[in-house]
UniProtKB/Swiss-Prot annotation:
Any one GO CC term of the record: cytosol
CDD domains associated with the record: OMP_decarboxylase_like
Top-rank lineage group of the source organism: Bacteria
Family of this protein: Belongs to the OMP decarboxylase family. Type 1 subfamily.
Active site: K63 (proton donor)
Positions with a binding annotation for substrate: 11, 34, 61-70, 117, 179, 188, 208-209
Protein's GO biological process: 'de novo' pyrimidine nucleobase biosynthetic process; 'de novo' UMP biosynthetic process
Pathway: Pyrimidine metabolism; UMP biosynthesis via de novo pathway; UMP from orotate: step 2/2
Name the record gives this protein: Orotidine 5'-phosphate decarboxylase
Database matches in PROSITE patterns: OMPDECASE
Keyword Lyase (UniProt): yes
Length: 230
């Protein structure tokens, strides 16, 4: 099911920056935000509790990757924060993914990271010693996530159609690396516009700097939201 709101990546490290950004939006505007490693490691669980107290949805993107017992226990702790979505690394293997699902339970959305959108095929082959194509690697990880009963994967928008062809109906694709036309792509290698992501049926999109670093973040958010909605 498509999420109508773009997920905003809160690329901050301080509570003050985060609060100042969220305060720009009217109280009735309920956002879906991503808390990544920087903000979570700087502020801890309290930042999740604060954002949830405002009525926003929280995607906690910590990309857990460890032995199954450790991941299961960590997910059980994160579940207590009432998060709406969490991530694990698909490279941890099917047993680790199953353990993550057990720890988190069935309610929060659980998705696996396949290949980072900053990774090129040459980098994958050289650094990870994976000698298939980048797409084949992503599809392999996606099928493993589906086998482990995860809800979906994080992937490049260019990979969505192929993933949906090899996974069960309802398997979701969350696509970072979304940039409005003409914006700086930063360190992302595989990017698309919100309109392009909508056309190829991404279920969630994540947008960070084009919103958080815009001169008018609220206007930037509304423009991207409208383009995503079509």
């Amino acid at each position: 099911m498509k999420e109508e709101r773009p997920i905003i990546a809160l690329d901050f490290s301080s509570f003050e920056e985060t609060k100042a950004f969220l305060d720009l939006f009217p109280a009735e505007e309920k956002l879906y935000v991503k808390i990544g490693m920087e903000l979570y490691y700087a502020q801890g669980p309290d930042i999740v509790r604060y954002i949830k107290s405002l009525g926003h949805n929280v995607f906690l993107d910590l990309k857990l990757h460890d032995i199954p017992n450790t991941v299961r226990a960590a997910m059980a702790v994160l579940k207590e924060l009432d998060i709406d979505m969490a991530t694990v690394h698909a490279a941890g293997g099917v047993e680790m993914l199953k353990a993550a699902r057990e720890g988190l339970g069935q309610d929060p959305t659980l998705i696996a990271v396949t290949q980072l959108t900053s990774t090129s095929e040459d980098q994958m082959r050289g650094d990870q010693n994976i000698q298939t194509s980048l797409l084949e690697s992503v599809l392999h990880y996606s099928k493993g996530a589906a086998k482990a009963q995860l809800d979906g994967v994080v992937c490049s928008a260019q990979e969505v159609e192929a993933i949906k062809a090899v996974t069960p109906t309802g398997f979701t694709c969350l696509t970072p690396g979304i940039r409005p036309k003409g914006s700086n792509i930063g360190d992302q290698k595989r990017v698309m516009t919100p309109n392009q992501a909508r056309r190829i049926e991404s279920d969630y999109i994540v947008v960070g700097r084009p919103i958080t670093q815009a001169k008018d973040p609220v206007a930037a958010y509304q423009a991207i939201k409208a383009e995503w909605a079509g």
